[in-house]
Amino acid sequence: MYTPAPQMAPAPEAVPVQATPEPQAKPKAPSKSKNGDVGGFIQQCISLCSYLKELQTQAHLIHLNYEGGNFLGVHGFLKDQYEAHLEQFDTLGEFIRSMDYLMPMCAKGLADAGPGIQHVTSYKGTEMLAVYYKNLEELGMKTKKLEPLAAKVGAIDIQNYMAELCGQAFKAAWFIKATLRNG
């Protein structure tokens, strides 16, 4: 015997959709932030990300353009450095996102968020390294300034990372300083 199918398929039960939380609005500039303001702190972290991205590019270009008797050592060191700067940028960016703030959408936005770095103006190896050395020292100082701010807003993960990043920056600067003294 034939049993006809229903004329209309039963409608599936609607599954309730949970609301997706919206990310925080763009943080205020540090000069407009109140003491202990998370948005101002995040803006400074984004500025540090911009600085790290500039350092990555600088280390990579020096890596490509460096010439000298110690080429092999410097070439390898700078490769490690630009790879480290990419990892540092990514880690700090992930910390920012974990606090539900957005990163800039493009290179221009990222560059606008940062103070910029000292630029290399010579192809002479020692001069390129001297500029990079100064920028690494500045990176270390920036992390020292951000570490207590991270503690103030309760971002202990970022606080710990600032201490780690500070050590990495000053160690790399020491390597370059020792190279410049002997070469």
Outline where the language-model segments fall.
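General structural feature for long, well-ordered alpha-helical segments within catalytic domains
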Residues: Q44, L48, L55, V74-F77, ...
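Helix-loop segments that flank and shape redox-cofactor active sites
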Residues: E54-D80, K142, L146-D157
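A structural signal for well-ordered alpha-helices, especially hydrophobic packing surfaces
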Residues: C49, Q56-A59, H63, F89, ...
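Acidic, proline-/serine-/threonine-rich low-complexity intrinsically disordered repeat tracts
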Residues: T3-S33
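Short, charged, low-complexity amphipathic alpha-helix
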Residues: K32-S47
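Conserved alpha-helical segments that form or flank metal/cofactor-binding pockets of metalloenzymes
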Residues: L72-G109
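Acidic/histidine-rich alpha-helical segments that form the ligand environment
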Residues: Q44-C45, A111-E164
